[in-house]
Amino acid sequence: MGLPGRRNPLLSARRAAASLRRSRRLPVYVAAVFFVASVLLMFRDEILYLTTARSPSSSLPTTGGSAGGAGLARKEELVSVNKPVLLGHGGKPEKHHSVTERHRPKVSAKRRPNKKAAKAARKKFMASPSVAAGAEVNVPETCNLSKGKWVFDNATYPLYREQECEYLTAQVTCTRNGRRDDGYQKWRWQPRDCDLPLAFDARLFMERLRGKRLMFVGDSLNRNQWESMVCLVRPALSPGKSYVTWWDGQRVVLHAWEYNATVEFYWAPFLVESNSDDPKAHSIRDRVIKPEAIAAHAGDWVGVDYLVFNTYIWWMNTVNMKVVRPTGKTWEEYDEVGRIEAYRRVLDTWATWVNDNVDPARTSVFFMSVSPLHISPEAWGNPGGVRCAKEDAPVQNWHGPLWLGTDWDMFRAARNASRAAGRVPVTFVDVTAMSELRKDGHTSVHTIRQGRVLTPEQQADPATYADCIHWCLPGVPDVWNLMLYARILSRPPAAAGHVA
């Protein structure tokens, strides 16, 4: 079949060839050649799409599983480090095709539905149960979503099933990796002064994303959140009309081409340039940053409609940071400065870029707060525990702060930087205190190390192998995304941001 709204190109080509034969002015073989050429011309859009947009994989490349800020896949874990990994909706393998960097697809370059198809899609959407019932999301901007409590809810949670989302990597599929309890999937966040939506309406959200790009930028916690988001929107994607590309690990993109939309992750663990920016060789002991240099990454952020930033976990290895001197030419020419000083310099660079380069009439900007670690069980009253291993419920009936080692100076610096963009409103999404209560939600020993699921012997040694940084999915990041969902859909497109 051709594209919607187009005449049948095969029939047109046949008629053209037949006309030539009837005219007796050309031999039959010339008419045949003309027929083939006509078919190729008529189907050029479909052929171009099939040969540039699809390739196979049995699964997405896995992320590094070590606790301590490990993020993207190691080189040996990638199907190919020079080719995109493509995964069709439904997990079916597709023909592999090499695509060079300069052929990286963009939303604007994808086939846009013609007016007839767009009208039909809109009519179908308006007739959907959620829209026909007058569904809407209206969470007041004045409501502080970060204050509340965790409520066990096995009726509406989890928001999706682990085994039904082919986009999840082995790092976060805790049930598949041997975790036997599933209570961690069934806790709903109840804000104190208002309500979050009970469900994530994927079709409603994808309609808001129609013709747009949503990009998570940062470290492996934002990658964790990206995986959650693509699972949440999955029910709105028709079979055969979405696929994932993995661009050398730097970007992972879900293409939902029936909506002409993308949901993307961009690897930039410090936001600015660093010697850890190569996703195939990022596990570097001596991490060095250029706190005033952001252009190498930021060029890929221009024009994105929804930007969700974070940076935290990669800062936590040392109390001092190595920063390249202003006149430095190599990564070896650095000075050591205090972590919070370096963090503030980076955030100043980021806020300046946002203020100078983002169009607030088009782009909404969010900054995710600190995602906490749970490596000190005595902090939540379990002195005999080992990191986050075997924790099966949130911290409950706790009054006062939890001393988990969260760097609250960095939290405040990020919040202040979100207010510093000036011309561009930035929504600071505060998930820190609520996530501190979720000692049960981490991948712990039900994850991977160097691309392989932990062995029984490794799982029996949580002091060495428990990952108490990243989160199981379904799980806590789904609630973070529900907060994004509430803020995005409660506003007109590109409305101003506030504190979530």
UniProtKB/Swiss-Prot annotation:
The active site is at residues 220, 467, 470. Keywords: Disulfide bond, Glycoprotein, Golgi apparatus, Membrane, Signal-anchor, Transferase, Transmembrane, Transmembrane helix. The chain crosses the membrane at residues 26-43. Expressed at low levels in roots and leaves. It comes from Oryza sativa subsp. japonica (Rice). This is Xylan O-acetyltransferase 2. One of its GO terms (molecular function) is xylan O-acetyltransferase activity. PANTHER family: PROTEIN TRICHOME BIREFRINGENCE-LIKE 9-RELATED, XYLAN O-ACETYLTRANSFERASE 1. Residues 103-116 have a biased composition (Basic residues). One of its GO terms (cellular component) is Golgi membrane. Residues 44-500 are lumenal. Residues 91-102 have a biased composition (Basic and acidic residues). Pfam families: PC-Esterase (PF13839), PMR5N (PF14416). The lineage of its organism: Eukaryota, Viridiplantae, Streptophyta, Embryophyta, Tracheophyta. A motif (DXXH motif) lies at residues 467-470. The keyword Metal-binding does not apply. Its EC number is 2.3.1.-. It is a single-pass type II membrane protein. Disulfide bonds join 143-194, 165-231, 174-472, 388-468. A motif (GDS motif) lies at residues 218-220. Residues 84-116 are annotated as: Disordered. Glycans are attached at residues 144, 154, 260, 416. It is found in: Golgi apparatus membrane. Residues 1-25 are cytoplasmic.
